[in-house]
């Protein structure tokens, strides 16, 4: 076997292993966090930093933000209940599981139950969104910002964008539980 052939076989095996890790089996018992790794978050941040022309609608940088704030975000109340409170409610979870299974088996199925649960939560309960770091960085670059004072720092998207653009950033937020995520 040639050296090049061995290398491609090894590469294929690595890719297959990565794919297996991404499409892990999910049974629907624990809350379906995205579980972004530190490596993925750093890679996403570096990708954002290296972009020269950004589309404000791009999702580049979202993993860097979600890495620090996703576990706190699910405890934020929307219409009186947080996503975690809804998840712990057996009646609400049963309805969600049924909806997720319909998504999983339906015509728009991705073949991944984990993603079906995430989609079901977003469609049935709510999504707690934040500004896209790519959009913030686009505006910072467009208006040649050198300093940013953010009175509603929120989930940290604008902070991540400022870091990616090497811009001085001061963020103020009344929610002290967000500090570890920053």
Where are the regions a protein language model picked out?
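N-terminal accessory regions of S-adenosyl-L-methionine
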Residues: 1, 18-129
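Generic hydrophobic/packing signal
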Residues: 2, 55-57, 67, 145-146, ...
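Long, low-complexity Q/N-rich tracts
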Residues: 3-21
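A short mid-domain helix/strand-loop element embedded in enzyme catalytic domains
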Residues: 113-138, 152-161
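Conserved S-adenosyl-L-methionine
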Residues: 136-182
């Amino acid at each position: 076997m040639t050296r090049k052939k061995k290398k491609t076989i090894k590469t294929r095996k690595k890719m297959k292993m990565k794919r297996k890790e991404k499409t892990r089996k999910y049974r629907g018992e624990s809350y379906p966090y995205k579980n972004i790794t530190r490596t993925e978050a750093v890679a996403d941040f570096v990708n954002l930093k290296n972009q020269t022309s950004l589309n404000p609608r791009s999702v580049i940088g979202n993993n860097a933000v979600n890495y620090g704030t996703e576990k706190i975000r699910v405890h934020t109340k929307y219409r009186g209940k947080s996503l975690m409170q809804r998840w712990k409610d057996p009646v609400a979870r049963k309805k969600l599981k049924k909806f997720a299974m319909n998504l999983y088996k339906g015509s728009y199925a991705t073949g991944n139950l984990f993603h079906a649960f995430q989609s079901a939560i977003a469609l049935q309960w709510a999504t707690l969104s934040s500004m896209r770091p790519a959009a913030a960085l686009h505006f910072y670059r467009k208006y040649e910002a050198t300093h940013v004072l953010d009175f509603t720092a929120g989930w940290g998207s604008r902070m991540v964008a400022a870091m990616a653009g090497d811009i001085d950033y001061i963020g103020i937020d009344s929610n002290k539980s967000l500090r570890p995520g920053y």
